[in-house]
């Protein structure tokens, strides 16, 4: 009797919600091979009970592969192979997986049709950087599929008047994901003094506020959907240094044996919006985090103290501590502004 999958997974699953798979028609045992994106990640043998065998904890295996390979979307195939010939396989089932480390009260298809791969709908835009905005289209590849057009709406200041410019087709910004800088937006919309940017792709929409001031710190991390996301924060950063020198006594001389030092950066944010609260949570839990310092430098967040409240009237802030992964402090050697440079001719005569 051929092996039958009793409860085949739906075509698109959240990575953390892959159901246990039951196989029927198993005489004694079944040999399985699990492929993710056509890469064999596991081979296992399951013994049968009353003709059935159960494959459990598949979510952990798939999520670990996606994390290790920076994937937000993967295809999973489960094969059966014979004892005497492992190369002879039979495909039992296959399905697609969308990564999400959160529990979402909707299907991945419904969510991805209405949302970008971010928990935020309103964000602060950092003018000095390129923004990446990821999306997944569950209908892509289906028959008669028509890709939605990216629409751009820009709010800008014309003197003291707020005006709006619209670009009906901004698809030039799409390259696997939506990538843009402030100069790209100004060129497309043919405007200056941009204060808001609204991107619409089908039912998905993201609003950016462009501030005149630079954010105190800009972080990048892999968010709940395992894609890169920028997070500019207005915050106060305190530097804490701990150093220890070890000395050794050689005959009558004391010599320096080793020098150890640690530098931690304690961050206290300004009041956060509800969208920023969710992003800070993901930043502190992310396995891959960076801070902007001319380039993105890898860091690790060693501790955090965050008290979040559902009460909107209460200001919500967060505190966390990070350090550079390579242990090297970063410095900026910037030129002084013109009004701070001493330009008077030197007079050697002392009055």
Give short role names for the model-derived ranges.
Residues 1-215:
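Preference for solvent-exposed, low-hydrophobicity sequence contexts
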Residues 2-7, 11-20, 134, 138-139, ...:
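Extracellular/virion structural assembly segments
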């Amino acid at each position: 009797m051929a092996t039958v999958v009793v409860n085949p997974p739906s075509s698109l699953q959240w990575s953390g919600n892959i159901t246990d798979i039951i196989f029927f028609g198993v005489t004694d045992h079944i040999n399985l091979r699990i492929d993710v994106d056509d890469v064999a990640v596991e081979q296992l043998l399951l013994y049968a009970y009353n003709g059935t065998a159960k494959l459990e904890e598949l979510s952990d295996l798939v999520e670990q592969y996606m994390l290790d390979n920076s994937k937000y979307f993967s295809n999973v195939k489960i094969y059966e192979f014979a004892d005497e010939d492992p190369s002879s396989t039979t495909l039992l089932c296959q399905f697609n997986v969308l990564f999400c480390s959160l529990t979402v009260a909707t299907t991945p298809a419904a969510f991805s049709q209405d949302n970008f791969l971010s928990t935020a709908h309103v964000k602060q835009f950092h003018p000095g950087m390129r923004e990446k905005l990821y999306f997944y289209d569950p209908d892509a590849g289906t028959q008669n599929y028509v890709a939605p057009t990216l629409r751009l709406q820009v709010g800008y200041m014309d003197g003291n008047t707020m005006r709006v410019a619209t670009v009906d087709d901004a698809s030039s910004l799409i390259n696997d994901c939506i990538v843009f800088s402030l100069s790209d937006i100004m060129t497309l919309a043919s405007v200056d003094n941009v204060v808001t940017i609204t991107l619409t792709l089908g039912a998905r929409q993201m609003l950016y506020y462009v501030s005149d001031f630079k954010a105190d710190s800009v972080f990048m991390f892999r968010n709940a959907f395992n894609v890169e996301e920028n997070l500019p924060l207005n915050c106060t950063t305190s530097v804490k240094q701990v150093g220890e020198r070890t000395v050794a006594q050689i005959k009558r001389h004391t010599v320096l044996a080793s020098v150890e030092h640690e530098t931690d950066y304690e961050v206290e944010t300004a009041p956060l919006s509800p969208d920023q609260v969710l992003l800070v949570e993901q930043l502190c839990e992310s396995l891959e985090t960076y801070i902007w310092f001319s380039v993105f430098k890898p860091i690790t967040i060693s501790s955090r103290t965050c008290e979040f409240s559902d009460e909107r009237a209460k200001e919500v802030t967060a505190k966390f501590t990070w350090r550079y992964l390579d242990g090297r402090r970063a410095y900026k050697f910037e030129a002084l502004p013109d009004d701070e440079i001493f330009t008077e001719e030197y007079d050697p005569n002392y009055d």
